[in-house]
């Protein structure tokens, strides 16, 4: 099933958490905390055509009590507001890698900082 987030939102599939501790104790599913990281599966048109700070395939970190959970085709996802994303894990867009090679400083400001005005 296709899902297109609206506004400044992204669709995220949580990353699986480890099933056992470092000492080998198996953690039952009902005792595990849900991971606070996931893979972006879809971005809204407002983000893909505007900010472009987050794109499909990025691994992101987000706040513990943020977003809305939905189930699509038996898979659990989160719908998150752009402002609820804490950061991109690993390499991301120019604004999250420190590579600010925009030809114009205004382009960088528009790309990465407009969503922080809220």
Swiss-Prot record:
Its recorded name reads Co-chaperonin GroES
Single annotated GO MF = identical protein binding
Q: Which UniProt keywords apply?
A: Chaperone, Cytoplasm, Stress response
One Pfam family per UniProt: Cpn10
Gene Ontology BP term (one)? chaperone cofactor-dependent protein refolding
Any idea what job this protein has?
Together with the chaperonin GroEL, plays an essential role in assisting protein folding. The GroEL-GroES system forms a nano-cage that allows encapsulation of the non-native substrate proteins and provides a physical environment optimized to promote and accelerate protein folding. GroES binds to the apical surface of the GroEL ring, thereby capping the opening of the GroEL channel.
Q: Which CDD domains match?
A: cpn10 (cd00320)
Subcellular compartments: Cytoplasm
């Amino acid at each position: 099933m296709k899902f297109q987030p609206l506004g400044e939102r992204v669709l995220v599939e949580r990353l699986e958490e480890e099933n056992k501790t470092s000492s080998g104790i198996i953690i039952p599913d009902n005792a595990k905390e849900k991971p606070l990281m996931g893979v972006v599966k879809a971005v809204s048109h407002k983000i893909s055509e505007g900010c472009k700070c987050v794109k499909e395939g990025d691994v992101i970190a987000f706040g513990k009590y943020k977003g809305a959970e939905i189930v699509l085709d038996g898979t659990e996802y989160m719908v998150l507001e752009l402002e609820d994303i804490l950061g991109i894990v690993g390499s991301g867009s120019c604004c999250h890698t420190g590579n600010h090679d925009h030809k114009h400083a205004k382009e960088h400001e528009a790309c990465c900082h407009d969503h922080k005005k809220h």
